[in-house]
Amino acid sequence: LLWRMNRRRLDVEAWRDAMLAAAGKLDLSLGGAPAELYKNDNVRRTLYGRIDRSDPDDVLRLFDFPDPSAHAPSRAPTTSALQQLFVMNGPFMLRRADELANLLTADDSATPETIVRQAYRRVFAREPSATEKRLGVEYLAAELASGKRQAAVARYAQALLGSNELLFVD
């Protein structure tokens, strides 16, 4: 008998949609013309993205999107340094982190503890553990002392959006 499922990494499409949803930007409208996914700040579901067979999107290729000009019964998952560089420096990730930070700091009176709790609810749909809450509050308290509230919360949001918990299904 199996008592648990092996961890699996989300496909890039589901991961992109999860980040857009956490940032409150995912456009759930049905139908319509396909659009470039990572250009012009497209926030439609990835399902509606335009795929060019001769020139697939660089971000999709980076995260194991199959060659659209050939049959691919499964994807060969890879892990590369470029993937983590995208998480740390990619314009898409930075925009999502800023948008999530805007949601978390909409109330100027929000305490670091409130921000951490709201962030975990939005990103992971759960409450943070005591350790996660303590570490998040300590980080935010130290960063907020610099007076750059939005930037501090955006960095925290980016760390959560780039975490394994969002990328993998347990």
Predicted regions and their residues:
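An acidic, gly/pro-interrupted, aromatic-rich
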Residues: 1-127, 160-170
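Short, charged, surface-exposed loops that flank catalytic or proteolytic processing sites
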Residues: 110-112, 144-152
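Amphipathic alpha-helical segments in structured regions that serve as interaction surfaces
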Residues: 115, 119, 135-136, 152
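Amphipathic alpha-helical segments that form the core helices of the histone-fold
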Residues: 134-144
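Globin-like tetrapyrrole-binding proteins
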Residues: 156
